[in-house]
């Protein structure tokens, strides 16, 4: 594995509950832009990161694996001085945050997967594998993936914009290498049985990372798991239903028992 990297990131809020958010395969950290204006920034502080090969880390060398991504996330938490934190991961980022849990379970307060890739990977039939593998060099493949995973209901302008962002803010070689890791690696034995509270949020219009798949994986592996299906949403909840996503995720994070301690500590006088 290559040396850890301090991931490019932006901080939002100054709340006592620290949260690290990791993007998915088809976007950099700007994937979270639609939700940023309406987050509870008094209760939480969010670090939104770019993984290697994306955004400001587009030219960063690496193995482009979920394990390396997890090591990078932990290095960032160390740099920020965050001993305990919650994690949010979208799609591929859901696999990365589960890797963080596997590597440092004592540091994770709560785990959120937004249409998360299971820790068992996502085996694809040959024709789908060809579509996904070819997406590195063929923008039209990315468009088909975006359209299919949002139920074929999103406007052409949005699909075109998402493809442009994906191509402009990712390195093609890194993009292709990430696929082998998140789709092909199975590490679920390292997180199975973890007592961490774990929320999976899925969209009813997403045929790939569906509620059915999460019931067979996430809900079986995490004893303290919750599953929420957003009815008018596909794979990209941050774009499709941002306010619903914020409410579901922040209600879940706010239920953490340590939040009471955080509030008391913040209000304590020297």
Region roles according to the model:
Residues 98, 102-103, 108-138:
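Flexible "cap/lid" loop of the alpha/beta hydrolase fold
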Residues 8-59:
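Conserved HGGG/HGGXW glycine-rich cap/lid loop of the alpha/beta-hydrolase fold
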Residues 224-270:
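Catalytic active-site module of serine/aspartate enzymes centered on a nucleophile-bearing elbow/loop
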Residues 68-84:
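Conserved acidic catalytic loop of the alpha/beta-hydrolase fold
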Residues 87-89, 114:
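Short beta-strand immediately N-terminal to the catalytic nucleophile in serine-hydrolase-like folds
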Residues 199-233:
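Conserved loop-alpha-helix segment in the C-terminal half of the alpha/beta-hydrolase fold
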Residues 89, 93, 97:
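Gly/Ala-rich beta-loop-alpha elbow adjacent to hydrolase catalytic centers
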Residues 122-123, 138-193:
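Conserved alpha/beta-hydrolase catalytic His-Asp/Glu region
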């Amino acid at each position: 594995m290559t040396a850890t990297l301090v991931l490019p990131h932006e901080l939002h809020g100054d709340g006592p509950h620290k949260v690290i958010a990791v993007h998915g395969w088809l976007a950099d950290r700007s994937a979270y832009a639609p939700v940023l204006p309406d987050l509870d920034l008094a209760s939480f502080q969010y670090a939104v990161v770019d993984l290697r090969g994306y955004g400001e880390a587009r030219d960063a060398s690496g193995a482009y694996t979920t394990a390396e991504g997890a090591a990078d996330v932990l290095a960032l938490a160390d740099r920020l001085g965050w001993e305990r934190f919650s994690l949010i991961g979208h799609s591929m980022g859901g696999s990365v945050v589960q890797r963080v849990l596997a590597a440092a379970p004592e540091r994770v307060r709560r785990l959120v997967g937004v249409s998360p890739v299971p820790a068992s990977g996502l085996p694809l039939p040959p024709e789908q594998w060809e579509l996904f593998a070819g997406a590195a060099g063929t923008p039209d493949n990315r468009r088909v993936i975006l359209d299919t995973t949002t139920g074929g209901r999103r406007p052409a302008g949005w699909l075109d914009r998402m493809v442009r962002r994906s191509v402009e803010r990712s390195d093609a070689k890194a993009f292709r290498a990430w696929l082998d890791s998140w789709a092909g690696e199975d590490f679920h034995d390292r997180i199975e049985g973890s007592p961490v509270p774990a929320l999976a949020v899925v969209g009813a219009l997403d045929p790939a990372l569906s509620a059915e798949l999460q019931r067979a994986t996430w809900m079986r592996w995490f004893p303290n798991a919750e599953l929420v299906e957003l009815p008018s949403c596909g794979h990209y909840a941050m774009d499709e239903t941002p306010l619903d996503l914020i409410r579901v995720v922040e209600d879940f994070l706010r239920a953490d028992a340590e939040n009471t301690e955080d509030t008391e500590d913040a209000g304590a006088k020297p």
